[in-house]
Design a protein with these regions (language model features):
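Partner-binding and oligomerization surfaces adjacent to conserved cores of proteins
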Residues: 1-170
Length: 170
């Protein structure tokens, strides 16, 4: 309703390896590792997918096709949006960190997650990311009653939002 998404801390995400990284023993002293940890903790992020027709995503994140997918736009001029690199955990070399290091660490995931085709929106000073909702896609297993509720809600909030049933393209 307010055209925004909650931005989570990385520790609130579902991947237990989130925020982990590799480094050579002795290259990063304890104070540098603490600084990285603190800087990662200061960031908030939204995890988004580029795909709306991925069966696994619907099963894992949309209540087994009973839920919805929201098609949205993020202003890339206003927010730092980065594609996830599925090359494993980020590898830090040298004893120095850059201002961008925490975002780089949080932009790497294990290859097993690559089906998500994820992009992340990073914010450091906000709890929300402004978005523009373009479409709402309802799951193939959504009840008629729930679909009707979603239809009424969209009509009241913003009738220009497209309502699409997933079974029309999956």
């Amino acid at each position: 309703m307010r055209n925004r998404l909650y931005a989570s801390r990385y520790i609130e995400l579902n991947d237990p390896m989130e925020g982990q990284y590799y480094y050579n023993k002795g290259e990063l002293n304890k104070s540098v590792r603490r600084k990285i940890s603190s800087d990662k903790g200061d960031l908030r992020l939204c995890s988004l997918s580029r795909k709306k027709d991925n069966e696994l995503m619907w099963s894992h994140y949309a209540d087994g096709h009973h839920g919805i997918v929201i098609g949205l736009t993020v202003d890339r001029g206003k927010f730092d949006v980065r594609p996830i690199q599925y090359t494993g955990l980020h590898y830090l070399t040298g004893g120095q960190i850059e201002q961008d290091t925490p975002r780089e660490i949080l932009s790497h995931k294990l290859e097993v997650w690559s089906y998500e085709e994820e992009e992340r929106v990073f914010v450091a000073d906000k709890f929300y990311v402004d978005i523009q909702v373009r479409e709402v896609i309802t799951g193939r297993a959504m009840s008629n009653q729930d679909f009707g509720f979603i239809r009424e809600l969209i009509d009241k909030i913003n009738p220009s939002i497209n309502l699409i049933k997933a079974d029309t393209f999956m």
